[in-house]
């Protein structure tokens, strides 16, 4: 097997279930998938699941680690269900583009952007 393509996934933590499915589908295609950490529901104990980094005082560290994942990737795939792209995800897109990484989107959000390439699975 030749070197597998490395894909970094970006998207809101509100899409955690869909992100996990997308990771699995891309892995089945033989890709190495880098993404953010998905935590089990029991971890949160009443905390807001979408902003856990802020609550634990580690948002800056987690954001920097994700940028290093983008550095390691061959391409970036954005899970933008319903066209949603939050502030952190937009920052990751901007970073990837500034560093010459191809950026693809699961759903078209702008006619000037590339939509997910045909080799990647549909996610609903």
Where are the language model's segments positioned?
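Conserved catalytic or regulatory cores that recognize and/or transform ribose-phosphate-containing ligands
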Residues: 1-124
